Each structure stands twice: as C-alpha cells, then as structure tokens.
Amino acid sequence: MSAYRQPVERYWWARRRSYLRFMLREISCIFVAWFVLYLVLVLRAVGAGGNSYQRFLDFSANPVVVVLNVVALSFLLLHAVTWFGSAPRAMVIQVRGRRVPARAVLAGHYAAWLVVSVIVAWMVLS
C-alpha cells in the first residue's frame, strides 16, 4: 500500500509573490549563462579578425537576438538586485563587537557595483 500524495498544481508557486520571485531568480541563471556565452562569442569574433567581428555584429542586429538580450538584461538586473538583497542576511559583519546594519552592507554592495560599472563603461567607451 502506498502513501497518499495530495495532488499539487503545476504552477503552485505562481500564486505567492515570494515563491514567484524565487522562481524568477532561479530562472535568471539561464540568462546569466546566455550573457557569458555571448561574451565568449564576442571575444572569439574580435580575436578572429574584422570579417568575423562584422558577421557577429550582423548576428547581434537580428531582432530575435536584440529581444533576447533585452530580456536577458532584465533578468540579469533581477538576479543582481536579489543577490545583493540577500547579502546582508548572509554576511554577518561586526565592527568593534557590533553588527554592521543591513543597510550599510547593502549600500556597500551597490556602491561597489556602481564603481565597477563606471570603470567598465569607461574602458568600453573610451
């Protein structure tokens, strides 16, 4: 005789905001992988020379790729924001025996993100 298993709907997680947000964050890993692959393809095209890079630019101009990159960027931002949001709970930092407030840890992460983004933008655009 087997134990009773209550039937569960397929999209049970979509009814509660916290579960939906968790699932979207987990799905965002697919788009993080896409961006890594895209970066590798860019580097390969640049390394192969001008013609290869032009073919890559033509591929990147395809509307499907543009839409995919916009969706991936939105998921990447969700991934980063939720990652930073969990940092104050995961990192217990103490200074002089007192715990650093969660807002300070969060502000530090966002400040570092901003600095790195400015440096990368400066390197790419200059």
Swiss-Prot record:
GO cellular component: fumarate reductase complex; plasma membrane
Keyword Cytoplasm: no
Family annotation (SUPFAM superfamilies): Fumarate reductase respiratory complex transmembrane subunits
TM segment ranges: 30-50, 64-84, 105-125
Gene Ontology MF terms in the entry: succinate dehydrogenase activity
Protein keywords: Cell membrane, Membrane, Transmembrane, Transmembrane helix
Superkingdom assignment: Bacteria
Cellular compartments annotated: Cell membrane
InterPro entries in alphabetical order: Fumarate_red_C (IPR003510), SQR/QFR_C/D (IPR034804)
Disulfide links within the chain: none
Topology within the bilayer: Multi-pass membrane protein
Function of the protein: Anchors the catalytic components of the fumarate reductase complex to the cell membrane, binds quinones.
Similarity comment: family membership: Belongs to the FrdC family.
Assembly notes: Part of an enzyme complex containing four subunits: a flavoprotein (FrdA), an iron-sulfur protein (FrdB), and two hydrophobic anchor proteins (FrdC and FrdD).
Protein name: Fumarate reductase subunit C
Organism: Mycobacterium tuberculosis (strain CDC 1551 / Oshkosh)
